[in-house]
């Protein structure tokens, strides 16, 4: 079933409202019409998240889960507590960092191949493996304090995006 979207008149470039929503102390929270101007990486530690996109995709994930949402789409997002309090963090990924990761995976590693097809989805999901949560937290905290160089940030982004590279849609979304 497709839902009708009424995007907000103001584009949300920095999705700070989603970042600060975690502090609202509610059992569930819905935000509608968020326009993603950049790709977003979400680390869902606990809780449940449901996302409906403007293209009609419906995504449901429970923590712990890593979620990649491609840019240039409008989403409706609902977050809920499950047995534990909702806990998530997100990082906006600029296009240059994603392009650098794409080039690294495609040109420096011969065992990866990029399909030449248009993606049918605009999201990727991956369970949070050992070390991924720590790298995500390091990158998340460094974005706030600006304590890492751009080269180190891009290296950490490549590490995080490597969780998705075996998905058929990954290269088309990067």
Enumerate the predicted regions with their spans.
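N-terminal regulatory/effector-sensing and dimerization cores
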Residues: 10-118
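Intrinsic low-complexity, intrinsically disordered segments enriched in polar/basic residues
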Residues: 1, 54, 58-59, 143-147
């Amino acid at each position: 079933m497709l839902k009708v979207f009424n995007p907000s008149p103001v584009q949300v470039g920095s999705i700070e409202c989603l970042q600060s929503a975690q502090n609202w102390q509610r059992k569930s929270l819905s935000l509608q019409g968020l326009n993603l101007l950049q790709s977003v990486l979400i680390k869902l530690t606990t809780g449940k998240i449901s996302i409906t996109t403007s293209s009609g995709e419906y995504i449901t994930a429970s923590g712990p889960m890593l979620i990649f949402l491609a840019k240039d789409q409008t989403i409706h997002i609902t977050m809920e507590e499950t047995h534990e309090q909702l806990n998530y963090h997100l990082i906006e990924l600029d296009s240059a960092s994603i392009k650098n990761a794409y080039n690294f995976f495609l040109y420096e590693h011969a065992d990866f191949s990029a399909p030449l097809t248009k993606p049918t989805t605009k999201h990727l999901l991956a369970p949070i493996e050992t070390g991924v949560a720590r790298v995500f937290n390091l990158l998340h905290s460094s974005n706030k304090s600006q304590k890492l160089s751009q080269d180190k940030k891009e290296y950490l982004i490549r590490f995080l995006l490597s969780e998705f590279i075996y998905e058929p849609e990954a290269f088309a979304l990067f």
